[in-house]
Amino acid sequence: MCIRDSCGEVLTEQETIPAAHRYVNGVCTVCGARDPVSAPCPGGKACPGSRFTDMPPASNWAHNAIDFTVAHKLFAGTSDTTFEPSARLTRAMIVMILYRLEGEPAAAAESAFTDVRSGAWYAGAIGWAAGSGIVNGVGGGRFDPNGLATREQTAAILYRYARFKGCDLDACGDLSAFADAGSVSAFALAPMTWAVGERLISGNAIGGRTLLDPQGVTTRAQFAMIMMRYILNVVQPAPEP
């Protein structure tokens, strides 16, 4: 179920991300949590990403999103000291991050995908996601776990996860604002429209134009931003004034 209650509630027995805070000047008046969007990073050791030598500066668009996802244990570093914001995500990595958000539940059964090896680090996550209707294969009984995740694949997986959680899927973005809207694949049209409507995905500046770039690859920094927006905009929208 998609929780929209007051600060301090949790999403499931396993999850620890509280539902809607009440922020005033960037700080929750109920529990004191810092708004990851509007409040400035405290800097120093208080910055969740302080251990990463390649952390973008606090003025960078990705900084707060990386802080948010690291603090909520959705992302780990690529090493003890690196995050690699520009590194590209694989399909298995996308599923693993959602699996962590869900609290890493036991899968009812292993997936039937022929290229998902039993015991692989992503096997449990893909088994859970496939059994929950969150992921489909790429055809021929394969999942392609090491394939790079495109932006439209990312939108489709997150859309199905939101449906699995019982979240509102009525948001309708205007894809006509993007010059390459016609290049969105049929399977991703509804998910991409939803993702734009929920402000999870915005355009990429390419060649002086703002494009959806649906076949472009999702980076770690981009997905950190998408996940922060998903949790704040979809799971726990701001209360009515």
What is each model feature region?
Residues 12-22:
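Extracellular cysteine-rich, disulfide-bonded modular repeats and adjacent stalk/linker segments
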Residues 37-63, 71, 76-125, 132-152, ...:
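Feature responds to low-complexity, polar/acidic, surface-exposed segments characteristic
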Residues 8, 32:
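Cys/His-coordinated zinc-binding microdomains
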Residues 11, 35:
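Cys/His-rich microdomains that often coordinate metals
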Residues 26:
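Cys/His-enriched microdomains
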Residues 1-6:
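Conserved small/polar residues in nucleotide/adenosyl-binding loops
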